[in-house]
Curated annotation (Swiss-Prot):
The active site is at 639 (glycyl thioester intermediate). It is an enzyme of class 2 (transferase). Its EC number is 2.3.2.26. This is E3 ubiquitin-protein ligase pub2. Interacts with the E2 ubiquitin-conjugating enzyme ubc4. Its main location: membrane. PROSITE patterns: C2, HECT, WW_DOMAIN_1, WW_DOMAIN_2. The lineage of its organism: Eukaryota, Fungi, Dikarya, Ascomycota, Taphrinomycotina. SUPFAM superfamilies: C2 domain (Calcium/lipid-binding domain, CaLB), Hect, E3 ligase catalytic domain, WW domain. Residues 1-112 form the C2 domain. Keywords: Cytoplasm, Membrane, Transferase, Ubl conjugation pathway.
């Protein structure tokens, strides 16, 4: 990545999920785009109503570390007092356009945030890379210090934020007034003082083109006026990597890009040397730490399943469901089972399929059922935010008159999965597990649910609160298009928030967001779970371990997979085996998970990975066997973690047949 800058063609396609108080709203939006506070572009107004589309295209020159900032404005909201600012978002180029990947076209979503949190959405962009533009960056062109000062020569030190979220300062004799003011001072400026600063800024930059200075003015204006918002955007692209190795220095180029100087070799590079140092120095330490975590978790698992209340009855519980109506069938059956029935050996049959359940069928049953239960379309659960796909209980689920029965059923399904050592395919927010373990929740837990909301609460905590904020002990909620005021305490809508009671206000808000808004639903779910798994068993785990117990491990390590794989009628040196592992290394995480689910019945793994995989008769490695004619598709034996692959003639043919198998086939048979 040394001395690399390249040209990209940015196409703004459309906006997704732009919400105002929970309702999709028709806007006349346009975007201001800036790259590293240098390139400023204004788009046309988007067309459409429910789907806001642009088709706007612009060429940009970027480096892997460049930060692209998008600001959204609404023409409809422009008036004498407002320029129609809606919100902003940012992304580091290398996070969605890796320079060393041969692919040239990348589609990405940049999340938009608004100061009030009332708007949510993302801008869908297409980046098309064209040519590289190598640049030499001499090491003596820029200087960095740790304070903002005016020296005797009249120069000032300009604040800059690098791609890691760190603040650095650039010495410049032509520094504008606005750049010489620290962020701490800006936070305390009144609107009138801000206006004076902006006016001075415009006066000092009269020589620039009117369009560019107007755009630059807007970018700076909204970053400064909405400091908590700008902070959250910077944190979105921040990556903390620790100190630089000995002999290295971080500097800024003339166009404000971060680069690194190795004084021992007198060379410069774009590459962060901490990436390699961290990786090499911490391998053995991390390995030991991970092994200790695995060992402790395995001891807890062994202890749990050795307890008398976790013993599986030798009698059989047979559940017969249809693939098309798995949720409905399972609800009708499981809701009526006694606790003693649920402790019998579980056998699943899919209607019109001959497959016998030696483990693989029940693994697939829980995989399919969890996708149905936790689908936000059923309104039992919802995504925490538009950019946080962790699930939480939906407060609006109580509109269903049978919601308690449904959540008791969900708790029973979770209990059955744990009791019979199966995995669900779901990702809850961390506070959900803490509630199950009866751990107290605090303000910091809000961050795991909604980081923007958390930053707003944190700002209230750390700053003076007065009447101008118009806060009281209530919240406004949207319930199916109707705005409803909910008191956080009795008569809360008539009690103003001030510096004396703001901590009580924050506590009440946290309690409402994480607990009381879904208390009845959670109690029903917890009751169903405790019918099979008592608290005395659950509470030996922490919240992260409980997530692993319920869902297994999500990350798939191809090298670990390869290390614990057996072969029948193939060897590691056969072309088909070599191609298989090459394909897995190239595939996306989603496609690898689909293959794992196809071959084993689940897309999840034990905490220690492939070495602890189980089949119908205990521990069983993943196996690749040479079976079938090249005209046939690969075949899976999920009960035995076995994949039958015919001896195809090329890597392309293997990929084509595997892709068809994992995407188009479903159902069990017998041999």
């Amino acid at each position: 990545m040394e001395n690399i800058r390249f040209e990209v063609q940015l196409t703004i396609l459309h906006v997704e999920g732009l919400w105002k108080n929970g309702l999709l709203r028709s806007l006349k939006p346009y975007l201001l785009i800036s790259v590293d506070d240098d390139q400023f572009i204004k788009t046309n107004v988007a067309s459409g109503t429910l789907r806001l589309s642009w088709g706007f295209t612009q060429k940009l020159t970027v480096s892997p570390q460049s930060i692209i900032l998008l600001q959204l404005f609404d023409e409809k909201q422009k008036n004498e007092t407002s320029d129609g600012f809606v919100g902003l978002g940012a992304a580091v180029v290398n996070s969605f356009l890796p320079f060393n990947n041969p692919k040239d076209d990348y589609k990405t979503r940049i999340t938009l945030r608004s100061p009030s949190g009332s708007y949510r959405g993302s801008v869908v962009c297409l980046f098309k890379r064209s040519k590289f533009l190598p640049e030499e960056l001499p090491a003596d062109k820029s200087q960095i210090c740790t304070d903002i000062i005016d020296d005797a020569s009249g120069c000032a030190w300009e604040t800059r934020i690098d791609e890691f979220g760190h603040v650095y300062y650039l010495k410049s004799p032509q520094l504008s007034v606005i750049s010489a003011i620290s962020h701490e001072k800006l936070e305390n400026l009144t609107p009138k003082q801000l206006k004076e600063v902006f006016s001075q800024f415009l006066f000092n930059n009269q020589s620039k083109s009117s369009l560019k200075i107007n755009l630059e003015y807007k970018v700076i204006k909204h970053l400064l006026e909405h400091y908590p918002l700008a902070l959250s955007v910077r944190q979105q692209v921040a990556v903390e990597k620790g100190p630089l190795p000995a002999g290295w220095e971080m500097r800024l180029s003339e166009d404000y890009h971060v680069y690194f100087v190795d004084h021992s070799t007198k060379t410069t590079t774009w590459s962060d040397p901490r990436d390699n140092v961290v990786a090499s120095d911490s391998v053995s330490e991390n390995t030991d730490s991970i092994q200790q975590i695995n060992d402790e978790y395995q001891r807890k698992i062994a202890y749990m399943y050795d307890r008398p209340e976790m013993a599986v009855n030798d009698a059989q519980l047979q559940l017969k469901v249809s693939r098309a109506t798995t949720f409905e069938d399972a609800y009708d059956i499981i809701s009526k089972l006694s606790v003693s029935d649920m402790k019998k050996k579980l056998l699943i049959r899919f209607r019109n399929e001959d497959g016998l359940d030696y483990g693989g069928v029940s693994r697939e049953f829980f995989y399919i059922l969890s996708h149905a239960i936790f689908n936000p379309g059923y309104s039992l659960f919802e995504y925490a935010t538009d950019d946080n796909y962790g699930l939480q209980i939906s407060p609006l689920s109580s509109v269903n008159p049978d919601f308690r029965s449904y959540f008791r059923f969900v708790g029973r399904v979770m209990g059955l999965a744990i009791y019979h050592r199966r995995y669900l395919d779901v990702q809850f927010v961390l506070p959900f597990y803490k509630r199950i373990l009866q751990k107290p929740l605090c303000l910091e837990d809000v961050k795991d649910v909604d980081e923007v909301y958390y930053e707003s609460l944190k700002w209230i905590k750390n700053n003076d609160v007065d009447e101008s904020l118009c806060l009281n002990f209530s919240v406004e909620e949207n319930r199916f298009g109707e705005s409803v005021t909910v008191d956080l305490i009795p008569n809360g809508r008539n009690i103003a928030v001030n510096n004396q009671n703001k901590m009580n206000y924050l506590k009440a808000l946290t309690e409402h967001k994480l607990v009381t808004s879904t208390e009845e639903q959670f109690n029903a779910l917890k009751g169903g779970l405790n019918e099979l798994i008592p608290d005395s068993v659950l509470q030996i785990f922490n919240e992260n371990e409980l997530d692993t117990l319920l869902n297994g491990k999500r990350d798939i390590d191809v090298q670990d997979w390869k290390r614990f794989t057996d072969y029948r009628s193939y060897t590691e040196t056969d072309d088909i085996v070599i191609w298989f592992w090459e394909l897995l290394s190239e595939w996306s995480p989603e496609k690898k998970a689909k293959l794992l689910q196809f071959a084993t019945g689940t897309s999840r793994l034990p905490l220690s990975g492939f070495k602890d995989m189980h089949g119908s008769d205990g521990p069983r490695k993943f196996t690749i066997e040479k079976v079938g004619h090249i005209s046939q598709l690969p075949k899976a034996h999920t009960c035995f973690n076995r994949l039958d692959i015919p001896p195809y003639n090329s890597k392309e043919e293997l990929e084509q047949k595997l892709t068809i198998a994992i995407q188009e086939t479903a159902g069990f048979g017998t041999e």
